[in-house]
Amino acid sequence: MRRICKEQRIKERQQLNKRKKPRRPFPAVEYAVVADNQKTLRLRNGTVLRQAIPGVGLYLSQGGRVYSLTAFGLRPRRIRFLKKNNYGKKSANGVPNGQRYPYVDFRRKKYDVHILVTLAWLRPCREGEEIDHINGNIDDCRLINLRIVTKEENRRCAQILRRLRKTAKQQNDPSLDPLNIPQSRLLKIFADITV
């Protein structure tokens, strides 16, 4: 009797294993370089990754994708975006938490993606500096959309973006929306207000 049950369980497990989807292969690392205590990985598909924080196994691409290096290899991390709850406020998983930016959970800590990208590819922010999303979309954490500015510049750029959105809405012209304006043009607009 016991033997039959054991054999049945083995068969059931084998059937379950057949139904499981095959795992996607991990990206293969072509080479790794360490310079200034910061690791740089190049994948076979041409993507270059940099380590944001030394000692933490998070690697970032210029496109804002986050990978973690584990014992099993390099794995893409899930970036969590905040959803609007019934009250129209942004929240994570329906629970308000005051967190506005996309983040990654890694080893029981939350890391904002835009901060990790600037740490990996630009430099750490100094006293009185902030990270500016050029097109005003905080969910867009690509390196091309991020820059380090002073608090005053960030405030002025936010005012300009609000005005552009308002005029686009009033004139019903989507080409005036900051999300549709090329970044080179936005940077020229912002260059006029720099301190």
Region locations from a protein language model:
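Conserved recognition-core residues within compact binding domains
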Residues: 2-5, 9-130, 137-190
